[in-house]
């Protein structure tokens, strides 16, 4: 049943068409005509989880368990290796329940080596024992525990009881041997949520804001008994999440994600306060609709666009990009000033 649900998720993701807004279009950054840089010398490398990446990007696989997942995960892992960027697995819950599905996840270990970054993935409601098993399965550098109450409550067979989730996160953070990333799944991390996570020792937060893959829509497309289309707009826009969470503290790694599709999106997300960027749906669309080369060309374009914007801002590396001044306006300014 879990395997079939994963297959439906992938199919419905490709069917989904609700248009949401990250509010990056409400962020103004200013062109610098006297740029004094050589494009080929612009450095996009970053250190993440103790390893050096060529670009501050994490690809979230989103898949695993379904028959098509093996090929998708294999191609995503190849992309991550070739571009020297990080790979995050889709939820490994299905593989912990069914040994026959483990191979759809472990294929990435045949491609990625100790120089690459692999991140496991489970629900934040998972036990410490399952978290350990998920890390062992992929020999991961870290584990991402996802928060997805909106998805679960719309999902017919989803969780309804979220009691004790913060205490569970704290237990895993304190007792797991690898770093723990806490991530949302498209509805965003608020200031209040971020503060609570930092207070229990979380050092890595993926804000996964509203503006990208909409799991409320994906789950609603599976339902025939109830309709949740009026809730498709639920969530905190990605730009607001980044601004609010970074204001709280600079002493944690902030991963910006949720509807990031272009080099300009990446540049703005970093300027607002992100240390890393995560992309899931956009890469998956290119891969499924056009194949490996299509996805490869998309990532090449994404990196080129980001470097181009860095050149036009007069910054030569990611640390300088973080210092670029910006202005916010429109709806983003309204909802950030409360």
Where do the protein language model's features map onto the residues?
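An N-cap/entry alpha-helix motif that binds or orients negatively charged groups
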Residues: 1-49, 53, 331-338
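C-terminal extensions of enzymes
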Residues: 1-3, 7-15, 283-338
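Active-site cofactor/substrate anionic-group-binding motifs, chiefly glycine-
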Residues: 48-98
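Hydrophobic faces of well-ordered beta-strands that scaffold small-molecule active sites
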Residues: 57-60, 85-89, 116-122, 145, ...
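Conserved, mostly hydrophobic/aromatic
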Residues: 59, 80, 143, 205, ...
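Short, acidic/polar
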Residues: 69-77, 126-136, 189-192, 262-266
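A gly/proline- and charged-residue-enriched helix-loop-helix capping module
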Residues: 84-122
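Glycine-rich phosphate/ribose-binding loops and adjacent secondary-structure elements
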Residues: 163-289
């Amino acid at each position: 049943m879990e395997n079939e649900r994963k297959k439906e998720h992938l199919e419905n993701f490709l069917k989904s068409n609700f248009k949401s807004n990250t509010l990056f279009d409400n962020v103004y950054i200013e062109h610098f005509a006297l740029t004094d840089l050589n494009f080929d010398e612009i450095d996009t490398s970053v250190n993440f989880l103790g390893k050096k990446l060529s670009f501050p990007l994490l690809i979230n696989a989103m898949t695993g368990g379904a028959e098509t997942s093996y090929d998708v995960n294999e191609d995503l892992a190849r992309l991550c290796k070739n571009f020297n960027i990080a790979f995050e697995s889709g939820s490994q819950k299905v593989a912990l329940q069914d040994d026959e599905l483990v191979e759809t996840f472990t294929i990435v270990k045949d491609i990625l080596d100790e120089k690459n970054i692999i991140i496991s993935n489970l629900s934040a409601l998972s036990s410490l024992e399952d978290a350990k098993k998920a890390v062992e399965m992929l020999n991961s550098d870290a584990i991402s525990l996802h928060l997805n109450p909106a998805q679960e409550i719309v999902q017919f067979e989803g969780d309804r009881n979220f009691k004790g989730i913060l205490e569970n996160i704290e237990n895993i953070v304190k007792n797991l041997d690898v770093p723990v990333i806490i991530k949302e799944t498209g509805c965003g991390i608020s200031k209040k949520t971020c503060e609570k996570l930092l207070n229990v020792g979380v050092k890595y937060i993926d804000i996964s804001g509203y503006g990208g893959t909409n799991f409320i829509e994906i789950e609603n497309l599976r339902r025939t008994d109830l309709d949740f289309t009026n809730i498709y707009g639920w969530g905190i826009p990605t730009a607001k999440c980044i601004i609010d969470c970074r204001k709280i503290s600079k002493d944690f790694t902030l991963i910006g994600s949720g509807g990031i599709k272009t080099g300009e999106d990446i540049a703005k997300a970093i300027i607002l306060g992100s240390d890393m960027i995560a992309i899931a749906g956009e890469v998956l669309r290119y891969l499924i609709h056009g194949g490996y080369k299509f996805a490869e060309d998309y990532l090449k374009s994404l990196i080129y666009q980001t470097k181009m914007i860095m050149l036009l801002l007069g910054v030569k590396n990611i640390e300088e990009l973080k210092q670029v001044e910006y202005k916010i306006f429109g709806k983003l300014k309204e909802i950030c000033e409360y």
